[in-house]
Amino acid sequence: MLARLVNRPNSTTAGEYIDRILRARVYDVAMESPLERASRLSRRVGNEILLKREDLQPTFSFKLRGAYNKIASLSNHAAARGVICASAGNHAQGVALAASRRQIPAVIVMPVTTPRIKVQAVADLGGEVVLHGDDYDSAYERALVIARERQMVFVHPFDDPDVIAGQ
């Protein structure tokens, strides 16, 4: 998957990312998660260790912020076509929840090996689950095909400026 990523000539600059981060609407759906001191671990390593409690988010992960920021940034025309992603877990739940908040369709392509609890969580959030392939790469390829066929917006889990700014 990472091998497919290439440096694009018009990639986003650091300044553009800062601007996107400042405009991110992530707290429409996510909470500002607290830092919690890990006392025993801090003593063990001889330094202060703080845990960022992203497990307190509605989907138990920071991935919600990136997915929500991307989906919130879509024009009404693009959003009306619906969104699609490939994921075996946290990004899938983030996309499903963000799409449900925006009241748009979401298709989530997951490997057939995805734990049932993750598949059910996506379905409970309103995502249309498509099980395909034994691994992420197979699900990813299928999601791209469906995106083209249905003219849906593909929400990449990390290679998207709006997702990055949200996370």
Feature locations, PLM:
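PLP-dependent amino-acid enzyme catalytic core
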Residues: 1-167
